């Protein structure tokens, strides 16, 4: 689905099914999480990784999954913050001065906590938000096959 059809959501669903099979390598769950994020479904990535983490007894694998789970939570939170910034801008015709302005009716109930113990940093001039602890957003760096006309 990913390479041939460019359908990240179907690819993520298929990969998640494969990751849930007995004996499946944990790398499948990590890839499925990235695909869910790529398909604009970071919440599904969080759910999948939390499930695999809970079912895994190998401590090394659990450590790896915990990092990926936290990265998925960061991605989910960043998208939530970006959406709230867009709603704020649509309502007030300007960007918020700070993230705290996003807490209120129609926006956010509260600001999310950065799971690595850092902060979510906001650049009011550009409207960008990032984690102080995660250098890069979750992306899949692989090129897709070119579609034939």
Predicted regions and their residues:
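Low-complexity, acidic interaction segments enriched in glycine
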Residues: 1-21, 27-149
